[in-house]
């Protein structure tokens, strides 16, 4: 398996990355036997229709913190995929960021015709290019240029221009993180090195399915994955994949809302086992970045009640360690 990875840092805010406490978490993650980490962090725009965004001095991870985290990950023997992500401050899913195709004429203060798409992509391209520069000089082995930006994916010319500009700065492999079931929307995967997707595919109808039952359910999803891999001649990476430790979550692995679901480590462990069995030997598949590993480890006394995506000190951690420790 080329990429035996985990996503790290997503819950971080300014002041969290790069600390000794964070490094302890990285070491525990590396101890599972993986060889990669996706360092994920967020920058926000105010709402889905905003055309400008930037660094938030109150909460955005600083460049120095990100660079220190990269150094810590590498010192633990992990390759790094840098993954800057754009979110909306109002809680709207980033997939809903979009703008009218037929715009009424709007003019700026200088009397020039404005374009929502031009403004947004200009800002987004600058955002990704900034972190491409960090990825280049810190030696990150991969860069992810976007995550689940469904409402923008049809703007092929803008994405191709972004990729062109990024390649002038960063000289490693590039990937884009599509959403599960929506991979066909991305017509420009040919310009990248890998096909990425958030692989939150449902593998049961209700809670309590066995690992064998979940593994069988993967066969349906694998057909579509192989089709898209064959179309572009690129390997697929699960840029995100995971399941909470709660009964019923393998029916909706993306879910983080239903806090009333009862805690169930077996549900999570079976989901992990099924995905690893299903994908491990597929020639069109490059690997996993599981979602997600906490920036700072959760205290043991809280883990016994936790129903989140984290797997530290849960049954799924043992499952993944057994697979990732394979030569």
What do the predicted segments below correspond to?
Residues 9-16, 50-63, 110-123, 146-153, ...:
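The substrate-binding groove and active-site-proximal loops of carbohydrate-active enzymes
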Residues 199-212, 228-269, 291-307:
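Active-site clefts of carbohydrate-active enzymes
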Residues 35-51, 64-152, 293-296:
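Substrate-binding cleft and catalytic face of glycoside hydrolase catalytic domains
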Residues 128-147, 178-218, 235, 243:
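Aromatic- and acid-rich polysaccharide-binding/catalytic face
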Residues 14-31, 54-75, 126:
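Aromatic- and glycine-enriched glycan-recognition loops and surfaces
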Residues 253, 267-274, 278-327:
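Aromatic-rich peripheral "rim/lid" segments of glycoside hydrolase catalytic domains that contact
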Residues 81-86, 90, 142-154, 160-184, ...:
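Aromatic-lined carbohydrate-recognition surfaces of secreted/lumenal glycan-active proteins
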Residues 14-30, 121-134, 179-188, 269-279:
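Short, acidic/polar
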């Amino acid at each position: 398996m080329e990429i035996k990875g985990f996503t790290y840092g997503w819950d971080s805010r300014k002041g969290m990355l790069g600390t000794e406490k964070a490094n302890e978490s990285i070491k525990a993650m590396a101890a599972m036997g993986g060889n990669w980490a996706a360092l994920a962090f967020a920058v926000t725009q105010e709402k889905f229709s905003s055309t400008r965004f930037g660094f938030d001095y109150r909460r955005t991870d600083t460049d120095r913190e990100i660079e220190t985290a990269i150094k810590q990950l590498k010192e633990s023997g992990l390759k790094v995929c840098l993954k800057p992500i754009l979110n909306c401050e109002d809680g709207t899913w980033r997939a809903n960021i979009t703008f009218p195709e037929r715009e009424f004429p709007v003019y700026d203060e200088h009397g020039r015709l404005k374009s929502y798409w031009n403004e947004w992509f200009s800002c987004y391209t600058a955002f990704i290019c900034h972190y491409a520069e960090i990825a280049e000089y810190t030696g990150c082995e991969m860069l992810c240029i976007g995550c689940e930006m469904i409402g923008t994916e049809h703007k092929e010319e803008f994405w191709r221009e972004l990729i062109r500009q990024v390649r002038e700065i960063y000289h490693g492999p590039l990937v884009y993180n599509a959403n599960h079931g929506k991979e066909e929307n991305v017509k420009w995967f040919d310009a990248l090195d890998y096909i990425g997707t958030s692989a939150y595919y449902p593998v049961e109808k209700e809670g309590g399915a066995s690992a064998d039952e979940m593994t069988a359910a993967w066969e349906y999803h694998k057909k579509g994955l192989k089709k898209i891999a064959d179309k572009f001649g690129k390997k697929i990476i699960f840029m995100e994949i995971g399941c909470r430790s709660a009964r019923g979550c393998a029916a909706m692995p993306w879910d983080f809302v239903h806090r009333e679901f009862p805690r169930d480590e077996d549900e999570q462990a079976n989901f992990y086992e099924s995905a690893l069995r299903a994908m491990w030997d597929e020639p069109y598949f490059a690997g996993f970045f599981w979602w997600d590993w906490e920036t700072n480890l959760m205290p043991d006394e809280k883990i016994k009640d936790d129903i989140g995506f984290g797997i530290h000190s849960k049954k799924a951690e043992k499952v993944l360690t057994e697979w990732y420790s394979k030569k």
